[in-house]
Amino acid sequence: MEYAIKEIARVIGAKTNQLLDDTVSLLLTDSRRLSFPEKSLFFALKTKTNDGHRYIQELYKLRVRNFVVSDMLPEFESMKDANFLIVKDTLRALQKLATHHRKQFNIPVIGITGSNGKTIVKEFLYQLLHNEFNIVRSPRSYNSQLGVPLSVWQMSEKNTLGIFEAGISQPDEMERLQPIIAPTIGIITNIGEAHQENFLSSNQKCMEKLTLFNDCEAIIYDGDDLFIANCIESACLSHKAIAWSRTDSEAPLFIESIDKKEFETIIHCTLLGFNRVVTIPFTDDASIENVIHCMAVMPVSYTHLTL
């Protein structure tokens, strides 16, 4: 999907040196990944160890002509046929553009968060659903402040379902990721010790993660995890909650028994009132839980996913 540079400048609130007519379809944050220079928009990101502005001259020589920068350096003045979109924060500009892109699509989107298992659950869901949906999903573990907008930018008119993961390491980060993913269905895998040092408490971290689901139609979680259940209630999200359970026979997905063999596990369950037997090639507790999270999406799919 292509965007005019003039539209992008408006969306990200950029000042400009000039606005030559041009369109782009690719976002670039790493100069080493350049493939189609004429259609690339380079974001000069600043990190603790690097500064993307250093690579603009090199990229210009390689025929890139569109840049988002926070500093207008003297050497850029000679690049008369290039567009420079000047913003205060280039990462924030990237996130704003990805949010705008997400708004162009009215398809179901599954958002996954939690301390562990996000990528595995995403890939398991892809295997379960890819025959029914044209799926766009996060590459690898692209779940950061940078990875999420790059993932969502992949959305196109051909897609009928999105599956994206979101990770945070400190407070207030999910507030930025939520409108980029804008999930219609949420999954929270678990709450562990990852990045705990940056939060005042596990409760604060869980509540921060649940921010992803503010506008969801359904939230899937382990109903036997009372800590997550209490956080969901505190966040006033209980009316959206769809819990799977090992103890509540009235749950949409009730796990009756888990029978571990040497090389496989047999799960006996009741799914929407129907008895099912599921055999999986895993025996470790983490993989079994990840599979059950994915199984819990199936009853949700009947009402919240549309072909």
Model-found features: residue ranges?
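Structural signal for conserved beta-strand scaffold positions within catalytic alpha/beta enzyme cores
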Residues: 28-29, 44, 69, 86-87, ...
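Thr-Gly-centered strand-to-loop micro-motif
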Residues: 43-46, 137-139, 164-165, 280-281, ...
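Phosphate-binding loop of NTP-binding sites
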Residues: 9, 92-223, 227-240, 299
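Acidic, Mg2+-coordinating active-site environments of NTP-dependent enzymes
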Residues: 11-12, 74-78, 187-305
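Loop/helix-junction capping segments adjacent to catalytic residues or to phosphate/diphosphate-binding pockets
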Residues: 50-53, 145-146, 171, 288
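Short, surface-exposed acidic/glycine-rich loop or hinge patches that mediate macromolecular interfaces
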Residues: 47-50, 88, 115, 142, ...
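N-terminal leader/targeting and accessory segments in enzymes
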Residues: 1-96, 283
